[in-house]
């Protein structure tokens, strides 16, 4: 969602308007920032990323447009994927602050800002994609950080060189090893946030790294690209985000039933290949149950290189 569209949804409260307070109490208005509301009917269908943008626009509408949108709020404005429940506060960066402070609606990050790390989107100033990815790597989970950088590389929002340069300009040294790990792990071949999160989970569980987007062909032609492929045992793991079934824009005019049949025929062709000895499917809900993912892969013959879930602590 662009800031201009978000701004068009805002209702700017008149001082102590009893009608607005009653509408809010009845659930007809959603309060997104002090003195800023949006109609519940407009709020309900918004994606989490769009809600983050709307809160950010509402917050800056009050703070003034000189504030710099950063972290998760900037990620949402760039169209980067958000993993899990996004924060309820809007992140801005203030180089004049001595320390980071989180209030009811705003998190003000204390960090140096270089002009090269800033850009304008419509009437708002926000951090560049590279700086945003670095900030996310410093403050969010590694799954979120990898999902963001994978997206940046795939969508060509930034390059790895720009990511490393943004890190070099960052004044904070604490947490640098996390940013380095994310940069080394990220790949433009991950086609969705779910694939990014699954890849991080597989690494944490100790499985060997898979080949990403491996092409498969038979006598008819190209079958498609496999999400995760372990050549040494002929195992394919396909991540199924379910959007291809539920969202009309991903079905290419096909019905849900037609998409299911198409996927079944595709999998039949994959299983018929001599190099494919097994196919495992993983969906979003499995990402919250890593032990079940590990068990499914183990049953298919994939052995861990490490035991136990590896965590990457903030340093």
Regions found by a protein language model. Give the residues of each.
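Short gly/ser-rich loop at a beta-strand->alpha-helix junction or flexible surface loop bordering the NTP-binding
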Residues: 1-177, 211, 305-315
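Surface segments flanking catalytic/ligand-binding clefts of nucleic-acid enzymes
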Residues: 6-19, 65, 153-315
């Amino acid at each position: 969602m662009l800031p201009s569209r978000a701004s068009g949804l805002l209702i700017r409260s008149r001082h102590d308007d009893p009608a607005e307070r009653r509408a809010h109490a009845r659930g007809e208005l959603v309060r997104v920032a002090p003195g800023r509301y949006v109609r519940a009917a407009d709020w309900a269908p918004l994606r989490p990323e769009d809600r983050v943008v709307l809160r950010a626009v509402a917050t800056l509408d009050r703070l003034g447009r000189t504030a710099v949108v950063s972290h998760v709020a900037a990620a949402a404005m760039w169209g980067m994927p958000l993993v899990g429940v996004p924060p309820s506060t809007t992140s801005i960066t203030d180089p004049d602050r001595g320390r980071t402070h989180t209030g009811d609606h705003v998190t003000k990050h204390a960090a140096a800002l270089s002009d090269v790390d800033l850009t304008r989107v419509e009437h708002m100033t926000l951090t560049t994609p590279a700086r945003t990815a670095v900030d996310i790597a410093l403050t969010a989970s590694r799954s979120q950080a990898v999902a963001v950088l994978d997206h940046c590389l795939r969508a060509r929002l930034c390059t790895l060189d720009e990511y490393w340069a943004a890190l070099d300009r960052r004044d904070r040294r604490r947490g640098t090893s996390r940013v380095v790990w994310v940069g080394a792990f990220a790949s433009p071949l991950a086609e969705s946030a779910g694939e990014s999160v699954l890849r991080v989970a597989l690494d944490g569980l100790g499985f060997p790294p898979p080949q990403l987007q491996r092409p498969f062909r038979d006598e008819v032609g190209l079958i498609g690209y496999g999400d995760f492929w372990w050549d040494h045992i002929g195992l394919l793991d396909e991540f199924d985000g379910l959007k291809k079934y539920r969202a009309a824009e991903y079905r290419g005019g096909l019905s849900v039933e037609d998409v299911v049949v198409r996927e079944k025929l595709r999998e039949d062709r994959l299983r018929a290949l001599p190099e494919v000895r097994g196919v495992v499917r993983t969906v979003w809900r499995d990402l919250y149950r890593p032990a079940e993912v590990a068990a499914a892969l183990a049953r298919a013959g994939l052995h861990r290189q490490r035991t136990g879930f590896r965590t990457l602590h903030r340093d």
